[in-house]
A protein has these predicted regions:
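Residue-level recognition of conserved structural "scaffold" positions that shape functional pockets
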Residues: 55, 384, 437-440, 467-469, ...
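Surface-exposed loop/turn and secondary-structure junction residues enriched for glycine/proline
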Residues: 348, 361, 381-382, 388-399, ...
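A residue-level detector for conformationally permissive "hinge/kink" positions
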Residues: 346, 369, 425, 452-458, ...
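Contiguous hydrophobic, helix-prone segments at protein termini
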Residues: 4-457
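Mature hydrolase/peptidase catalytic cores and their serpin-fold inhibitory cores, especially
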Residues: 424-486, 490-500, 508
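Acidic, glycine-rich flexible loop/linker segments
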Residues: 1, 472-488, 492-574
Length: 574
């Protein structure tokens, strides 16, 4: 469940960023203003869950040529399991087509100019972000008034959100190049184009998403070489370890502080403002280090020893086929497209760390506002601020709020959102008319009536090769048991903050996502067998049951005889 502050912030951010992107593509200001309804509704909040309003994403694609192809590419990138066709390509008259030519030319010129200069733009974006990031003195936020904190938030809106177009344009580039490479593979008759394409994308160096994991592995090596420190790490609770280490090993304590300073905002659920990060609680960092210590063979040297092998095998399969069937010139074009896709994915993953840190800055600002509102008796506790919307915080500061008794508003919201935690919603559904009026949000099935709990085989999309036979560990939050020790990590979705858990997993299976989602990219970088897009995965599989997963075919076979007894117990309980 996502809190009102996170949703209202994300919704405003999407509007701001995509509005600037339309302007960058040369769309006339009058047209941008005419599409405010679309821009304000890129996201939806249903029973506390954030959804894409996919029709408005389709409408955004209408600003680009080749709607059908771009629609298909976007669906593949997002991992949509049931695309819809409520938004169709526009059938224009000759006069309308002529009138639209200048806009199309501006969009194409702007887009492809940026595609050609993407590395330079990414470098400039990262420099810009680093300057703004360092301008915020996080350790001094407590010295600012509520008004000054609101002004700082608005300043970041102007300096960051209104200059976030490079990541969006690069996402378009990823979408288009991924579709283009996929069509190349289909053209030469590759039997499993998704699998081969995943292997072609593996072994990519310079992906910053894996740097936190690699730094933790170096820290783990330091612990292994210091037996007294290792004994302390293994014998103390995660919540007190930072204080224990401070008095025991100054050098390692500094390593911990450096990690928190660099990657303290990178945590599970990092795109929720209400998430507790390493800056507030370092427990997750030590849980990961203990996981690493439990696997004596886990080092940087052994982390991804098979990556180059799978990539080379895929290249040895594809390159001769392309040349034999399409010629040497086509092979050159294919190599160029593949290289562009690899670069675009690397750039996307590296810019995502900037997104993580941006959320961290806003999180600290709003948390301090909560501290002060609590101090002045306007909220019962500081974290109640996450049950206000961004506009309500701004309006309270500006003197235009329609409800100034904040705590009664928070109490009603907390009760409502607590009830949402027990709601089980599908990953997509249709609505008709007013969204919150008479819509059941039960598409494509109602409840669990069509979920086959007895299924012996499940199928998703393979992301990285390997056959693993092991117990599964269902993990949904940092509060769950995180000790994997070779077990298969199963969850609904992941974000970049999950990456440190991956090296100790025997395999990774994610209910939602695509071959371009973060879990797939990092699994390829770390060389871990992975499957994504498995419908109802976490409803069907039971924690600790034994399965066999195939990262090539995307198949999952249930092996544990205990499954039958677990199912019997569930049936008797119901």
């Amino acid at each position: 469940v996502t809190t009102p502050l996170t949703f209202s912030f994300a919704n405003r951010a999407y509007k701001t960023v995509y509005e600037q992107t339309l302007r960058l593509l040369g769309v006339n200001e009058s047209v941008v203003q005419a599409h405010q309804g679309m821009l304000e509704n890129m996201l939806g909040l249903i029973h506390g869950r954030v959804y894409y309003n996919i029709n408005n994403w389709y409408r955004g694609l209408l600003f680009l040529p080749s709607f059908k192809q771009n629609k298909s590419d976007m669906e593949r990138m997002m991992g949509l399991t049931d695309p819809v066709d409520l938004v169709e390509d526009q059938a224009l008259t000759t006069k309308q087509k002529i009138k639209k030519i200048p806009q199309v030319i501006r969009a194409l010129y702007s887009m492809f100019t940026r595609f050609r200069n993407m590395d330079k733009l990414v470098h400039e974006f990262r420099q810009m972000f680093q300057g703004e990031y360092q301008s915020v003195k996080r350790e001094s936020l407590h010295t600012l008034t509520i008004g000054q904190l609101v002004n700082e938030s608005r300043r970041l809106d102007k300096q960051l959100l209104e200059n976030w177009t490079t990541p969006i344009v690069n996402d378009f580039y990823v979408m288009m190049m991924n579709g283009r490479v996929h069509r190349w593979l289909e053209k030469v008759g590759i039997e499993n184009p998704e699998v081969v394409q995943n292997n072609l994308l593996s072994g990519e160096e310079g992906i910053e998403s894996t740097e936190p994991t690699k730094m933790l592995l170096r820290m783990c090596d330091y612990i292994r070489n210091n037996k007294a420190l290792e004994a302390s790490v293994l014998s103390n609770e995660n919540s007190v370890l930072l204080n224990v280490i401070q008095t025991q090993d100054a050098e390692f304590y500094q390593q911990c502080q450096t990690y928190i300073e660099l990657y303290g905002d990178r945590t599970m659920g990092e795109l929720k403002l209400e998430s507790i990060t390493l800056r507030q609680d370092s427990s997750f960092m030590f849980a990961v280090l203990k996981n690493f210590l439990a696997k004596s063979d886990l080092t940087l040297a052994t982390l991804a020893e098979n990556e180059a092998k799978f990539r080379q095998e895929a290249e040895d399969t594809v390159m001769p086929l392309v040349r034999a069937q399409l010629g040497r010139r086509a092979l050159g074009k294919f190599n160029k497209d593949l290289s562009a896709l690899r670069d675009a994915i690397r750039n996307r993953e590296n810019m995502r760390l900037a997104r993580t840190r941006m959320f961290g800055l806003y999180r600290d600002i709003y948390s301090e506002i909560g501290e002060q509102l609590s101090f002045y008796g306007k909220l019962d506790e500081p974290r109640d601020v996450f049950y206000l919307t961004l506009e309500e915080i701004y309006a309270y500061n500006d003197g235009r709020g329609v409800q100034t008794h904040l705590q009664s508003l928070v109490a009603a919201r907390k009760e409502e959102f607590a009830g949402y935690k027990s709601h089980d919603l599908p990953h997509h559904f249709w609505t008709k008319g007013a969204v919150y009026c008479n819509n059941t949000f039960e598409y494509p099935h109602k409840g669990d009536e069509n979920v086959d709990f007895d299924a012996s085989h499940l199928v998703g999309t393979g992301c990285y090769p390997g056959i693993v036979e092991e117990k599964i560990r269902l993990i949904f939050s940092p509060d769950d048991e995180l000790n994997l020790n070779g077990q298969i990590l199963c969850t609904v979705r992941t974000d970049p903050g999950w990456a440190p858990l991956f090296p100790t997993a025997g395999g990774i299976i994610v209910e939602r996502g695509s071959t371009l989602s973060h879990s797939a990219v990092v699994a390829r970088e770390l060389g871990i067998p992975a499957i994504v897009g498995v419908p109802e995965l976490t409803k069907i599989l039971q924690d600790q049951e034994i399965i066999r997963m195939n990262g090539i075919t995307g198949t999952i076979e249930r092996l544990d005889s205990a499954v039958e007894s677990a199912l019997t117990e569930m049936s008797e309980a119901s």
